[in-house]
Curated annotation (Swiss-Prot):
Residues 1-3 are cytoplasmic. This is Cell division protein FtsB. GO terms for biological process: FtsZ-dependent cytokinesis. NCBIfam families: PRK00888.1 (NF002058). It is found in: Cell inner membrane. Residues 31-73 form a coiled coil. Part of a complex composed of FtsB, FtsL and FtsQ. One of its GO terms (cellular component) is plasma membrane. Keywords: Cell cycle, Cell division, Cell inner membrane, Cell membrane, Coiled coil, Membrane, Transmembrane, Transmembrane helix.
Length: 99
């Protein structure tokens, strides 16, 4: 009976060692849980970005307003009959009086 109890205690010690410091231990489990959470956050952000891009693609395929807006902003195109004005030096630094 004594041998049986000693064997159980040794097995319990080995299992505890494996649980706390072996492969697939609890500390490793918690690190992996943090990595999974970070990856899921990144995936959620990328899914939102993909949804915005899908909506933009649908908008570009279906209507001319989005194409016209992009042409105006990115290519500087102007409608017939409009006058184009360019403001030069619009970003002036405001200087405060020195003391």
């Amino acid at each position: 009976m004594k041998f049986f109890v000693i064997t159980l205690i040794v097995l319990l010690g080995l299992l505890q060692y494996r649980l706390w410091s072996g492969d697939n231990s609890l500390p490793e489990y918690f690190v992996l849980q943090k990595q999974i959470a970070a990856q899921q956050d990144g995936n959620a952000k990328l899914n939102e970005r993909n949804q915005v891009l899908k909506e933009e693609i649908i908008d570009l395929k279906s209507g001319t307003e989005a194409i016209e807006e992009r042409a105006r902003n990115e290519l500087g195109m102007v409608k017939e009959g409009e006058t184009f004005y360019r403001v030069v030096g619009g970003d002036r630094a405001v200087s405060s009086p020195s003391q």
